[in-house]
UniProtKB/Swiss-Prot annotation:
GO terms for molecular function: neutral L-amino acid:sodium symporter activity. HAMAP family: Ser_Thr_transp_SstT (MF_01582). It is a multi-pass membrane protein. Signal peptide: none annotated. The gene is sstT. It is found in: Cell inner membrane. Keywords: Amino-acid transport, Cell inner membrane, Cell membrane, Membrane, Symport, Transmembrane, Transmembrane helix, Transport. InterPro entries: Na-dicarboxylate_symporter, Na:dicarbo_symporter_sf, Ser_Thr_transp_SstT. The lineage of its organism: Bacteria, Pseudomonadati, Pseudomonadota, Gammaproteobacteria, Pasteurellales. This is Serine/threonine transporter SstT.
C-alpha cells in the first residue's frame, strides 16, 4: 500500500479501515521520530500526539452530557408497564465479571508469576477497605448533578439521569419531545467526534510508542502474557459461551463485530467512559432497542468490569507468588471477586483498576508498601495491560446488551 493510498483511507472508507490506517501511520511516526529529531529539531511523535489528546478530551467531554440526556430521555419516554431487559443484562454483567475472575485465578495458579518489584508509586488515592470503596460509591451517587457532569462523575450522572427520567415519565408529551431532541442533538455531535477517531488513534499510537516503546515491557513478558492471554480467553471463549446461552446461534459474528468496532477504539482511548459514545453508535447500527442500550451501555461502563477483575486478580496473585505466600484456591477466588466487584468505583478512568490492587492485597495480608510497588508494575505494563483491559470491558458492554436484545427478538418471533 503506497503512502497516498494510506492517507486517503484516513478521509474515506469505513471507520475500521481508517482507524487501521491511523494505527499504521502512528507506528511509522513513532519509529522515525527519534532519528529525525536531530534533523528537524523536535520530536515529531510528541507533536502529533496532541491529536490523540484532543480526541480523548472530546470523547470525555461529551460522554457525561450524552449519558445524562440519553438515559433521561429514554426513561421519560418509556411507557409505564413496558417490559425492561435490564435485569437480564445486569445478570450477564455480573456473571461475566465472576467468570473472568474465575479464569484469572486459574491462570494465576497454573502460570505462577513472580516480578521484580519496581520503585514505590504513590497509592495514597487507593481505597484502604471495602467499606471505604462502598462509601465513595454512595457519595458519588448523591453528588450534585451539575458537579457530577462537570467532573465526569459517571455514577452520579447516571443516578440523576435515571431519577429525573423516572420522575418525568408523567410529564407532558412536549417536555418528552424536548428531551428526545436534546438527546438526538448530542448524538449527532458524538457522530462528528467519532469520525475523527483515525486521527486520534494516529496521535495516541505515535506518542505512546515513542515515549515508552516496547523495550520497557521486556522484563514483564510473562506477566503480560498471562494477563493478556486471560483477557483474550475471556473475550473469545467465555463471552461467546454466555452469548450463545442467550441467542442460541453462532455467537462469533457478533463477538467479532463488537471487538472490531468497539474494542479497537477502547484499546487506544483506554477509558470505558470515553468509549460510551462509540458503543452507542454501534448499538444503533445493530438495530438494538434504544430504550435498552441507552441505559445498559452507560451502566456497563460503571459495573461491567471483567477486565478489571482479571487485572486485579493476576497482579495480586503475582504479589502473592513473589512473596512466597500460601493462599488456597477458594480464598484467592473469593477475595479477588470482592475486589473486582468493588472496582466499579474506579470505572471510567484509564488505569483505574490498578488503584484497587492495595485493596485486594490487604485481603491477603500483604503490606501497603508491596501493594504500592505492584501498582508501579501495573503502570510499567500499562501500555498494553490497561488498553487490553479497557477493550475487553467496553466491547463486552455492547456485546451483552446485543445478546439480551437478540434473545428478546428470538422469543418474540417464536
Amino acid at each position: 500500500m503506497n503512502t497516498s493510498r494510506l492517507f486517503s483511507l484516513l478521509f474515506q472508507g469505513s471507520l475500521v479501515k481508517r482507524i487501521a490506517a491511523g494505527l499504521v501511520l502512528g507506528i511509522v511516526v513513532a519509529l522515525i521520530s527519534a532519528p529525525l529529531q536531530e534533523t528537524i529539531g523536535f520530536n515529531l511523535a510528541e507533536k502529533v500526539g496532541v491529536l490523540g489528546t484532543i480526541f480523548v478530551k472530546a470523547l470525555r467531554a461529551v460522554a457525561p452530557i450524552l449519558i445524562f440526556f440519553l438515559v433521561m430521555a429514554a426513561l421519560a419516554n418509556r411507557k409505564i408497564g413496558t417490559k425492561s431487559n435490564m435485569k437480564e443484562i445486569i445478570v450477564l454483567y455480573l456473571l461475566g465479571t465472576f467468570l473472568a475472575a474465575f479464569v484469572a485465578v486459574i491462570a494465576g495458579f497454573v502460570f505462577p508469576t513472580e516480578v521484580v518489584l519496581a520503585a514505590k508509586e504513590d497509592s495514597s488515592s487507593a481505597p484502604q477497605a471495602v467499606g471505604q470503596v462502598l462509601l465513595t460509591l454512595i457519595l458519588n451517587v448523591v453528588d450534585n448533578p451539575l458537579n457530577a457532569i462537570f467532573k465526569a462523575n459517571f455514577i452520579g450522572v447516571l443516578a440523576w439521569s435515571i431519577g429525573l427520567g423516572l420522575a418525568l415519565r408523567h410529564a407532558s408529551d412536549a417536555t418528552k419531545n424536548v428531551l428526545s431532541d436534546f438527546a438526538e442533538g448530542v448524538s449527532k455531535i458524538v457522530h462528528v467526534i467519532i469520525s475523527f477517531a483515525p486521527f486520534g488513534v494516529f496521535g495516541l499510537v505515535a506518542e505512546t510508542l515513542s515515549d515508552k516503546g516496547l523495550v520497557a515491557l521486556g522484563g514483564y513478558v510473562q506477566l503480560l502474557a498471562v494477563l493478556i492471554g486471560t483477557m483474550l480467553f475471556t473475550a473469545f471463549v467465555v463471552n461467546p459461551i454466555l452469548v450463545y446461552w442467550k441467542i442460541r446461534r453462532n455467537p462469533y459474528p457478533l463477538v467479532w463485530t463488537c471487538v472490531r468496532e468497539s474494542g479497537v477504539t477502547a484499546f487506544f482511548t483506554r477509558s470505558s467512559a470515553a468509549n460510551i459514545p462509540v458503543n452507542i453508535e454501534l448499538a444503533k447500527r445493530l438495530n438494538l432497542d434504544e430504550e435498552t442500550y441507552s441505559v445498559s451501555i452507560p451502566l456497563g461502563a460503571n459495573i461491567n468490569m471483567a477486565g478489571a477483575a482479571i487485572t486485579i486478580t493476576i497482579l495480586t496473585l503475582a504479589a502473592v507468588h513473589t512473596l512466597g505466600l500460601e493462599v488456597s484456591f477458594v480464598s484467592a477466588l473469593l477475595l479477588s471477586i470482592v475486589a473486582a466487584l468493588c472496582a466499579c468505583g474506579a470505572s471510567g478512568v484509564a488505569g483505574g483498576s490498578l488503584l484497587l490492587i492495595p485493596l485486594a492485597c490487604s485481603l491477603f495480608g500483604i503490606s501497603d508498601d508491596v501493594a504500592a510497588q505492584m501498582i508501579g508494575v501495573g503502570f510499567i505494563i500499562g501500555i498494553l495491560q490497561d488498553s487490553t483491559e479497557t477493550a475487553l470491558n467496553s466491547s463486552t458492554d455492547v456485546l451483552f446488551t446485543a445478546a439480551v436484545c437478540m434473545e428478546e427478538e428470538r422469543k418474540n418471533a417464536a
